[in-house]
From Swiss-Prot:
Name listed for the protein in its UniProt record: Probable cell division protein WhiA
Gene name of this polypeptide: whiA
Keywords annotated in UniProt: Cell cycle, Cell division, DNA-binding
Pfam family, one: HTH_WhiA
Similarity comment: family membership: Belongs to the WhiA family.
GO molecular function: DNA binding
Protein source organism: Streptomyces avermitilis (strain ATCC 31267 / DSM 46492 / JCM 5070 / NBRC 14893 / NCIMB 12804 / NRRL 8165 / MA-4680)
One of the GO BP terms on file: regulation of sporulation
Length: 329
C-alpha cells in the first residue's frame, strides 16, 4: 500500500473520544475537502474524499456529534479520476451544521481560514485539525531526497492556519503556492515522523522510518562504493605511471642501481596495476607496503638525480600525456 493510502487508512480507524477533537477534525475535513453551496436559498455542505473509510468516519461523526444525517455518494473512476471518490452531502440542516463547525461566522459569512474554536483550541485540536486536513487533501511521498508531507489547501488563509497549527505542535511547516494552488509542506524527515505520530499514525511512522533508514543505508553504501571505486581507479593509474617511471629509472642507472631497489622496481614493472600491499606480498622475502613504497621512491629519486647530473631526461619523461593528466587529476 502506498504511504499516503496507508496513513489515511490508519488515521481513519483511529478512535478519538474527546468531543472537542472530533469537532475539530470534522471542521477541518469540511474546510479542506468540502464546499458550501446555496440551493434554493439553503446551504448544502459537501465533502469529497478519496477513501471510503474516511467518508464513513465523517458521515458517522456528523451524525453522532452534530446530530445531522448525510448521504454518501460513490463516484466511480472516470475521466481524470483514477480511483473512486466519496462525497458526503448534508442537505437538511446544512445551515446549522455550517455554523456548528465554524464554516460560517455569526452573520453567515464563510470562514476563509480554520474556525476560531480550532485556531484557539488545545494542542489536541491542532492535531485533530491536521488529521482532518490530511484525510481531506493530504499526501506523503516515499522517503528520499524529495520526500514531503503535503496538504492541498482551499486558499492562502487556510494554509496559514494549518502552518500555525503545526507550529503549536512544534513542527516546521511552510505554506507555498504552486501554479495557483496553495499547499502546506513539511519536508524534514524528522518533522514528518513527528507529525505522523501526532496524527496517530503509529504504524505508518514505523514503516516510514524503516524505509527512510533503508534508503539512507543504501545511499551510504552507494557513496562508499563510488568512493572505493574512485580510489581503486586512482591507485591503479598511479601504479601504471610508477611502472613507467621505474622503467626509465632502470635505464638511467643501468648497473649502478642497488639490487634491493632494482628488485622493488622490477616487481612494479611486472605487476603494473598491483597495489603496494600486493607487491610487498610478492617480494622475497615479503615486505610491508611502506617498505616497497620507500624503495621505489628512492630508486626514482636516485635516477632523477643521475639524469640531472648527466643532462638527460628524467623518469617523468617516460610518462604518456594521459598518465600525466591522470596523476594531475
Amino acid at each position: 500500500m502506498a504511504m499516503t493510502a496507508a496513513v489515511k487508512d490508519e488515521i481513519s480507524r483511529l478512535p478519538v473520544t474527546r468531543t472537542c477533537c472530533r469537532k475539530a477534525e470534522v471542521s477541518a475535513i469540511l474546510r479542506f475537502a468540502g464546499g458550501l453551496h446555496l440551493v434554493s436559498g439553503r446551504i448544502v455542505i459537501e465533502a469529497e474524499l478519496d477513501t471510503a473509510m474516511a467518508a464513513r468516519r465523517l458521515k458517522r461523526d456528523i451524525l453522532e456529534i452534530f446530530g445531522h444525517s448525510s448521504e454518501l455518494i460513490v463516484m466511480a473512476p472516470g475521466g481524470l479520476r483514477r480511483g473512486s471518490r466519496y462525497v458526503v452531502r448534508v442537505v437538511a440542516g446544512g445551515d446549522q451544521l455550517a455554523r456548528q463547525t465554524g464554516l460560517v461566522d455569526g452573520r453567515g459569512r464563510p470562514i476563509r481560514g480554520l474556525p476560531p474554536q480550532v485556531v484557539s483550541g488545545a494542542t489536541c485540536d491542532a492535531e485533530a485539525a491536521w488529521r482532518g486536513a490530511f484525510l481531506a487533501h493530504g499526501s506523503l511521498t516515499e522517503p528520499g531526497r524529495s520526500s514531503s508531507l503535503e496538504v492541498t489547501c482551499p486558499g492562502p488563509e487556510a494554509a496559514l492556519a494549518l502552518v500555525g497549527a503545526a507550529r503549536r505542535l512544534s513542527i516546521a511547516a511552510k505554506a507555498r503556492e504552486v501554479r495557483g494552488v496553495d499547499r502546506v509542506v513539511v519536508r524534514d524527515g524528522d518533522a514528518i515522523g513527528a507529525l505522523l505520530t501526532r496524527l496517530g499514525a503509529h504504524e505508518s511512522v514505523l514503516a516510514w522510518e524503516e524505509r527512510r533508514m533503508r534508503r539512507e543505508v543504501r545511499a551510504t553504501a552507494n557513496r562508499l562504493a563510488n568512493f572505493d571505486d574512485a580510489n581503486l581507479r586512482r591507485s591503479a593509474r598511479a601504479a601504471v605511471a610508477a611502472g613507467a617511471r621505474v622503467q626509465r629509472a632502470l635505464e638511467i642507472l643501468a648497473d649502478e642501481v642497488p639490487e634491493h631497489l632494482a628488485a622493488a622496481g622490477r616487481l612494479r614493472m611486472e605487476h603494473k596495476q598491483a597495489s603496494l600491499e600486493e607487491l610487498g606480498a610478492l617480494a622475497d622475502p615479503p615486505l610491508t607496503k611502506d617498505a616497497v613504497a620507500g624503495r621505489i621512491r628512492r630508486l626514482l629519486a636516485m635516477a632523477d638525480k643521475r639524469a640531472q647530473d648527466l643532462g638527460i631526461p628524467g623518469t617523468e619523461s617516460n610518462l604518456t600525456e594521459e598518465m600525466a593528466d591522470n596523476l594531475a587529476g
